[in-house]
């Protein structure tokens, strides 16, 4: 397991939030200089590899794993296709957690679901069901997510008070994720949609 491969794995897991240089160095137990050196190697590797669609975007001392610009039209085509519009069970479960626990970070959602949820979050953001509600104070400045006005309209809610009792929700979370409200209403508006098991975008 090389240092470069460890960096690649971390960048993949943190998703669109990216990660700061100091936090990455801390996780790797390396100096910031050494970490940046290895990051640069990975960035140059992606840039020179015509068979890779990946790229590392550097903003200040923050790094995000992205796709290369030349794939933008292809990804836009996918985003607009009917196949991409259906929300998976994983996305609906993620949405229910955000609705009840907002504002909440991706890491907190991951801990509740027990799996990595960046794909579901990206899908929900693209569908305008959730949005950024601020940042966590501290290292990394993780994004906090919450539901949108479109979410309220989409599920026929006038306010979050119309959701089932939060204490009951927290009790149920210990056994099974409560997504029935969202699943039923989503199925009503998307009768041809199919949900799949596991984490899907």
From Swiss-Prot:
Key words of the record: Cell cycle, Cell division, Chromosome partition, Cytoplasm
GO BP, one example? chromosome separation
Q: Which domain of life is it from?
A: Bacteria
GO CC terms, sorted: cytoplasm
List locations, semicolon-separated: Cytoplasm
User: What InterPro entries would the database entry show?
Assistant: ScpB_csome_segregation (IPR005234), WH-like_DNA-bd_sf (IPR036388), WH_DNA-bd_sf (IPR036390)
Q: Which Pfam families match?
A: SMC_ScpB
What is the purpose of this protein? Participates in chromosomal partition during cell division. May act via the formation of a condensin-like complex containing Smc and ScpA that pull DNA away from mid-cell into both cell halves.
The annotated subunit structure for this chain is: Homodimer. Homodimerization may be required to stabilize the binding of ScpA to the Smc head domains. Component of a cohesin-like complex composed of ScpA, ScpB and the Smc homodimer, in which ScpA and ScpB bind to the head domain of Smc. The presence of the three proteins is required for the association of the complex with DNA.
Q: Tell me which family the UniProt entry assigns to this protein.
A: Belongs to the ScpB family.
Which PANTHER family does the record match to this protein?
SEGREGATION AND CONDENSATION PROTEIN B
The name under which this protein is listed is Segregation and condensation protein B
Gene name, Swiss-Prot/TrEMBL: scpB
